[in-house]
Amino acid sequence: MFRAQSFLPVLALVLRVAAHGYVDQVTIGGQVYTGYQPYQDPYESPVPQRIERAIPGNGPVEDLTLLDIQCNGSGGSGTKPAALIASAAAGDEIAFHWTTWPSSHVGPVITYMGKVPSNTDITSYSPTGSDVIWFKIDEAGYENGKWAATDIMSAQNSTWTVTIPKALAPGQYIVRHEIIALHQAETYPGAQFYPDCFQVQVTGPGTETPTSQALVSFPGGYTPTTPGITFNVYSGSITSYPIPGPPVWTSNEAFSGGSSSSAAASSTAVASSTADSSSSAAATQSSSAAPSSSAIGTSTASSAAASGTAIVDANTCMNSA
């Protein structure tokens, strides 16, 4: 005889999985990479190599004091470096495609980058909570009655696009992209953080490294009293939202060192060839649409040879999906 009680835990799990999200695909400099698949990759043999650091699932981080707030994770230990690294030039776009995102999970979309220290390889580097390396390159919150994480991103096919600052010096960087869901953020803890981290080798003629005023650590970049961490989205009189964290950095000259603004979405709509994630993935997996290996610059290739890092093109990642 079927027992309703035995079905309830399964139903609860299904609802939990359906109610959250993560980045399942990223387009960097026009090349498409499969993100880490938390419900598939750990069970593959061999485990697929990715440019994204592993995440435990699609659930949130809620404790701002844990290392998990940095790049996701569970139990406070954070996450481990990925095996691969993508290549991009300063000024290139990065488009993050999210799995289905619930309309109730309103909030900001924020992207940071963190430079890997000299003489350190990104595939073996895990920032500590005291490493002040993270600078914000993009943010969007609430404007004209629209939330970035729901209204705006939904109109962009669940995709958010940012630009690597043109002034940025070459090197290895961790790109930290997150949504902060505010549907339970009236008190702390309550806000839900969904960070995903990707490994990128930046090339180009840029010469600038953000000054200390632009940098934060994770944990540390947000606290329970940081504006925007507690926020009542049901007040009925919202006109603006204070986005947590430092101001956006595009260059040291442009960086003002002031407080973060609740700017309109600074992302751009993804081109139709990449906005439709399913068609992009299919095109990338086909041999006829495989990206050219010439997309990896000479300087990047020589850097990879020196460090032993596996610089990959999109075809490598997509074929391991």
Curated annotation (Swiss-Prot):
The keyword Glycoprotein applies. O2 binds at H183, Q192. Pfam families: AA9. Its EC number is 1.14.99.56. It is a lipid-anchor; GPI-anchor. Keywords: Carbohydrate metabolism, Cell membrane, Cellulose degradation, Copper, Disulfide bond, Glycoprotein, GPI-anchor, Lipoprotein, Membrane, Metal-binding, Monooxygenase, Oxidoreductase, Polysaccharide degradation, Signal. Disulfide bonds join C71-C197. The keyword Disulfide bond applies. It comes from the Eukaryota. GO terms for biological process: cellulose catabolic process. It is found in: Cell membrane. Residues 294-321 form a propeptide. Cu(2+) binds at H20, H105, Y194. GO terms for molecular function: metal ion binding; monooxygenase activity. A lipid is attached at S293 (GPI-anchor amidated serine). It catalyses: [(1->4)-beta-D-glucosyl]n+m + reduced acceptor + O2 = 4-dehydro-beta-D-glucosyl-[(1->4)-beta-D-glucosyl]n-1 + [(1->4)-beta-D-glucosyl]m + acceptor + H2O. InterPro entries: AA9, AA9_LPMO. It is an enzyme of class 1 (oxidoreductase). One of its GO terms (cellular component) is plasma membrane. Glycans are attached at N72, N157. Lytic polysaccharide monooxygenase (LPMO) that depolymerizes crystalline and amorphous polysaccharides via the oxidation of scissile alpha- or beta-(1-4)-glycosidic bonds, yielding C1 or C4 oxidation products. Catalysis by LPMOs requires the reduction of the active-site copper from Cu(II) to Cu(I) by a reducing agent and H(2)O(2) or O(2) as a cosubstrate. Has broad specificity, cleaving at any position along the beta-glucan backbone of xyloglucan, regardless of substitutions. Shows minor activity on glucomannan. Belongs to the polysaccharide monooxygenase AA9 family. This is AA9 family lytic polysaccharide monooxygenase A. It comes from Gloeophyllum trabeum (strain ATCC 11539 / FP-39264 / Madison 617).
